[in-house]
A protein has these predicted regions:
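Charged, amphipathic alpha-helical coiled-coil/dimerization segments
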Residues: 14, 91-149
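C-terminal regulatory/oligomerization modules of transcriptional regulators
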Residues: 1-21, 143-166
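N-terminal helix-turn-helix DNA-binding core of bacterial DNA-binding proteins
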Residues: 40-84
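Alpha-helical transmembrane segments and membrane-interface helix-loop junctions
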Residues: 71, 75, 111, 157, ...
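Pre-recognition alpha-helix immediately N-terminal to the DNA-recognition helix
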Residues: 30, 57-60, 120
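Short, locally clustered residues in the helix-turn-helix/winged-helix DNA-binding domain
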Residues: 35, 60-66, 126, 153
């Protein structure tokens, strides 16, 4: 796996090794910081509804992505371990936030559907997520945000091509 130091060399960035190491460390820490900050912002809501973070993440994933409705979808798309998905789905069912529904034509496939009981936490969770994103992009002008998303889209397209070619 390429690390940021090699990426800076490949991209012909004119920086020192010390600067590359600094970028590498911040690149590694970046995802961790986002996760820590998001979890920290979620704590009051989790406490209010007495839910663990993983159960909340699963509920919000189902609410925000109606095209994904199964435990397998959660495992594959959200990369949450199957045993954690199973335990937390059971909890969400017991708490009345979701129901299980067999898929017509395929008894082996079970859909997970948010219930009206989940509406309040979903509404508050979506507001929390929207506010969190707003805070992430504070002090960034529109041009910087646009460049960021254009760059991310291009990287995603390049990754798709690499995966397709190999």
């Amino acid at each position: 796996m390429l690390i940021l130091r090699e990426l800076t060399i490949l991209c012909n960035l004119n920086i020192t090794m010390k600067e590359a190491d600094s970028l590498m460390n911040s690149g590694i820490e970046f995802a961790q910081k986002i996760n820590l900050a998001y979890n920290s912002v979620c704590k009051p809501l989790l406490h209010k509804f007495n839910l663990p973070q993983t159960a909340f993440d699963i509920l919000m994933f189902l609410a925000n992505n109606p095209e994904y409705t199964t435990a397998r979808d959660i495992v594959e798309v959200r990369k949450i371990k199957a045993n954690l998905v199973s335990v937390n789905v059971d909890r969400l069912v017991c708490d009345g936030y979701i129901i299980r529904k067999e898929t017509k034509g395929d008894r082996r496939k079970t859909q997970l559907i948010c219930t009206p009981v989940a509406e309040e936490i979903i509404k508050e969770g979506q507001a929390l997520q929207k506010d969190f994103l707003k805070q992430l992009f504070d002090n960034m002008d529109t041009a910087t945000k646009k460049a960021f998303f254009i760059g991310m889209k291009q990287i995603e397209d390049n990754l798709d091509k690499i995966l397709e070619d190999n």
